[in-house]
UniProtKB/Swiss-Prot annotation:
Organism: Mycoplasma mobile (strain ATCC 43663 / 163K / NCTC 11711)
Domain of life: Bacteria
GO biological process, one term: regulation of translation
Keyword Hydrolase listed: no
Signal peptide (UniProt feature, chain positions): none
UniProt-recorded name of the protein: Large ribosomal subunit protein uL1
Family: Belongs to the universal ribosomal protein uL1 family.
Residue ranges of the TM segments: none
Gene Ontology terms for molecular function: rRNA binding; structural constituent of ribosome; tRNA binding
InterPro entries: Ribosom_uL1_bac-type (IPR005878), Ribosomal_uL1 (IPR002143), Ribosomal_uL1-like (IPR023674), Ribosomal_uL1/biogenesis (IPR028364), Ribosomal_uL1_3-a/b-sand (IPR016095), Ribosomal_uL1_CS (IPR023673)
Gene from which this protein is expressed: rplA
Gene Ontology CC: one annotated term: large ribosomal subunit
Pfam families: Ribosomal_L1 (PF00687)
């Protein structure tokens, strides 16, 4: 272990003394997460939110996306697909990295060389995409109406994605993990992003949920410690 890594670890240990017993405000937690990130890349700032959900019930399966006011700090490559040339032209102007008609799309999917992070499609293309669900699904590339990636207005969807969106999905345990930005972003911008995501999820509380809805909320960076945040239900 290098001296630099050891020194960084010592700094982290000093900063996170008794962290398990502390509850932070949102801005304090983000500041702490940034201070304890010593990886060599621009780490993500992530939110983990434990919700009182029974995801076996259809109305308690939360999934969607929300536009963040200050973006995510990530460069997202978007593929837009439609069989309408006008739609593709508008999507290209909106910032799509790749545009594909049905023939182009089938060629891309058959090659399994996916040089994109998100796919946006108009609903008419879903029968074609459905054939490749077993390939796209596990990679998280299958478009979904709940995340706004299946839409008649693909240009608008591309524009929103390029500006920055946070996707959220409750797992079987009712936990949502989502990124709100990068360590290099200002704390104020990250706080604003976090508030938008948290408020969105708060408003989606299913009517059938009994008791405390938001049970635990933490902020962390990639490979960094977690900091617990005071929740206002």
């Amino acid at each position: 272990m290098s001296k630099k890594i050891t020194k960084n670890r010592q700094k982290i240990n000093e900063l996170i003394k008794d962290v398990e017993n502390k509850i932070y405000s949102l801005d304090e937690a983000i500041e702490m997460a940034k201070k304890t990130s010593f990886v060599k890349f621009d780490a993500s700032i992530d939110i983990s939110l434990k919700l009182n959900l029974d995801t076996r019930k259809a109305d308690q399966q939360l999934r969607g996306s929300v536009s963040l006011p200050n973006g995510t700090g990530k460069i997202i490559r978007v593929l837009a697909t439609s069989d309408e040339k006008e739609q593709l032209d508008l999507a290209k102007k909106a910032g799509a990295n790749i545009v594909a008609n049905k023939s182009d799309l089938e060629e891309i999917l058959k090659s399994e060389k996916f040089d994109f992070d998100i796919m946006v499609t108009d609903p008419k293309m879903m029968p074609t995409l459905g054939k490749y669900g077993k390939v796209l699904g596990p990679k998280g590339l299958m478009p979904n109406p709940k995340t706004g990636t299946v839409t008649p207005n693909i240009a608008k969807a591309v524009e929103e994605i390029k500006k920055g969106k946070a996707n959220y999905r409750a797992d079987k345990g009712g936990i949502i993990n989502s990124s709100i930005g990068k360590v290099s972003m200002g704390t104020t911008s990250l706080v604003e992003n976090a508030k938008v995501l948290i408020d969105t999820i708060r408003k989606l509380k299913p009517a059938t949920v009994k008791g405390i809805y938001m049970q635990n909320l933490t902020i962390s960076t990639t490979m960094g410690p977690s900091f617990k945040i005071k929740i206002e239900n």
